[in-house]
Amino acid sequence: MVKILGVIPARYASSRFPGKPLVKIGDKTMIEWTYRNASRSTALSELVVATDDTRIHEVVQGFGGNSVMTRADHISGTDRIIEVANLFSEYSIIINIQGDEPGIEPELIDGVAGLKASHPEWKMSTAAVPLIDFSHGEDPNRVKVIIDRNGKAIYFSRSLIPSQFKQTVPLYRHLGIYGYDRDFLLKYNSLPKSNLEESESLEQLRAIEAGYGIGVYLAQEAGLSVDTPADLEVVIEDFKKRKWIT
C-alpha cells in the first residue's frame, strides 16, 4: 500500500499579510482550519505542518495537530517540503498543501494524491479548474495550464493560454497543490533552473522543461485562498454561509 504524507508549509513572515497562519476565523486560527479540513482527506496516511516559527508550531501542537520545525532560510515552500520529506522517509508520495486555504476540500487532496498514485510515470501531480470568467485569464496572478488528452500538463503560464483566436478549447486555471514522488522531490533542486521558470516565475516549469510529466486533476471549483486582509473578509463571509462560524 502506498503511504502518502500531506505537508502544509506555514510561514509567519508573509510580506503581504504578516502572521497570516494565526489570524482567527471564528474561534479557530487559519492554520487550524486548513489542518482540520485537510485531515478529512482519506488518501493521506499522515498530515504535518512544516514551519520555521515557534508560535505556529505551538498553536498546531495545542489543537492536537502534527508539526515540525524547519530551517528559516528556505527560499521557497518546495525547499521546506524537501526538508520534511527527508525526515519522513517511509512515505513514497508527498502532497504539498497550501496553508492559506482554510476551506480546502478533502476531495481535492484525494484527487491529486490518487492521480499521482495511479500514474507512477508522472513524477508530479497538481490540479486545475475550468476558467469560467474570461477576465481572469488576463490576471497574471491566476496561473493558466494547458492539458493534453491524457491529463498531463503541457504548459503553465501567467498569460492567457491557449490563444482564444477561435475559442475551440476550454481554459483552465491552475490550483497551487502538488503531489510528488518522494525520490523525484529529493532531487528537484538539483535540476537546472529553466529559462521558462525564470520567465514566468513558475517553479513547476523546471520539471516540464526537464521532460518530466505533471498530471492534472480536474476539480469542480477553486477554494478561497487568503493573500491579504481583504481576502480574509471574503473567507469569513463564506464560512458564515456554510454555517461553520457565526
UniProtKB/Swiss-Prot annotation:
Question: Quick one: which pathway?
Answer: Nucleotide-sugar biosynthesis; CMP-3-deoxy-D-manno-octulosonate biosynthesis; CMP-3-deoxy-D-manno-octulosonate from 3-deoxy-D-manno-octulosonate and CTP: step 1/1; Bacterial outer membrane biogenesis; lipopolysaccharide biosynthesis
Reaction catalysed by this enzyme: 3-deoxy-alpha-D-manno-oct-2-ulosonate + CTP = CMP-3-deoxy-beta-D-manno-octulosonate + diphosphate
Q: Superkingdom, according to UniProt?
A: Bacteria
Provide the species name. Leptospira borgpetersenii serovar Hardjo-bovis (strain JB197)
Keywords for this protein? Cytoplasm, Lipopolysaccharide biosynthesis, Nucleotidyltransferase, Transferase
Primary subcellular site in the record, as a coarse category = cytoplasm
Gene3D superfamilies for the chain: Spore Coat Polysaccharide Biosynthesis Protein SpsA, Chain A
Gene Ontology cellular component terms for the protein in this record: cytosol
User: Per its record, how is this protein called by name?
Assistant: 3-deoxy-manno-octulosonate cytidylyltransferase
Q: Which SUPFAM superfamilies match?
A: Nucleotide-diphospho-sugar transferases (SSF53448)
Q: Name one Pfam family in it.
A: CTP_transf_3
The UniProt entry, under CDD domains, shows: CMP-KDO-Synthetase
Under which main EC class is this enzyme filed? transferase
